[in-house]
Amino acid sequence: YYICESCWTCESCAGSTESSCVSACNACDLCPNK
């Protein structure tokens, strides 16, 4: 889950365990704050 923080900073998803956020974190390019 913490891959989020190393990919981008996103207030709504960073550190989140919600499946939609986890998927975004794994993709690294679905967050506009990339």
Swiss-Prot record:
Intracellular or extracellular location(s): Secreted
The entry lists its GO molecular-function terms as: ion channel regulator activity; toxin activity
Main localization is secreted
> Which keywords does this chain's UniProt record carry?
Disulfide bond, Ion channel impairing toxin, Neurotoxin, Secreted, Toxin
Looking at the record's lineage, which domain of life comes first?
Eukaryota
Listed under GO cellular component are:
extracellular region
Name the tissues where it is expressed: Expressed by the venom duct.
Please describe the post-translational modifications of this protein.
Contains 4 disulfide bonds.
Q: Is Metal-binding among this UniProt entry's keywords?
A: no
- Please state what the annotation says regarding this protein's domains: The cysteine framework is XXII (C-C-C-C-C-C-C-C).
Q: What does this protein do?
A: Acts as a neurotoxin by inhibiting an ion channel.
Name the UniProt record assigns to this protein: Turripeptide OL127
What organism is this sequence from? Iotyrris olangoensis
